[in-house]
Amino acid sequence: MVTVFMVLFDELVRLKRVVFLSPYANFNLVFGLSLAKHLLKFLHSIYMFCEFDIPSSVLSILDESEIKRLYISKTVHNVNISNAEGVIMILDKEVNNMYRILRIDIKYLFIFIPRLKLIKDIHDLIIYRVRKASTGIYQFLTKERRYFVKVIGTQVIEVSIPHNLELIVVELNDIINTFGSIKASDFVKYCMHKMNLRREECVDLVRKAISMGIIKYRGGYLTLT
């Protein structure tokens, strides 16, 4: 039984064409197959191109009916995808496979890749950067949004973030984008005034964000991961 982070998956379906910059191979497999499971709720079939073998234990994310509608291959060569409804690619490096896919008009396209040298070549795709926040917890980052998921085995589980903690992250992000950095003590004072919280509450929120890997503390200064 897979618990799907529905908010993020629904957002990805709305965006349709997304690149995930993620160096985490196992995470890419589990999340990619969980995304395929979500897409197969309304698509007849999906093509998945994965450069390495997928363990049967990970394929257990899908039921028998879903597996029959998921076409898996290590390469796009000799595969007719001109009429494909959806494609998921899990790559360990930049290869011609990806650029061939980009030339085809595919409605739902999701690519997992560790890095991209030529981001301008994929200007029509939304880019999410995936960062490991703490053990089993990953962040999906864009300039505007930040999602959290937890992977346990083959399960993708929602990670809820307290509202005040989310506000702390937003405030720190705005300050860093404007000034570059801020002392931890100054940020606590700022949050006390801006959010009308007691000092102890602000300190606890900052510590919580640090423990989750959302905020980094170094030399008395705070930065985002």
Residue locations for each model-derived region?
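Glycine-rich P-loop/Walker A and Walker A-like loops and their local beta1-loop-alpha1 context
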Residues: M1-L43, M48-C50
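A short, well-structured beta->alpha microelement
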Residues: T3-V7, E51-M98
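Structural motif
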Residues: L21-A25, M48-D53, I88-V95, F112-R115
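Short amphipathic alpha-helical interface segments
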Residues: S160-M192
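Short amphipathic alpha-helical interaction segments
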Residues: N196-I210
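A short, conserved structural fragment
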Residues: I210-G220
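Flexible loop/N-cap segments at domain edges
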Residues: L222-T225
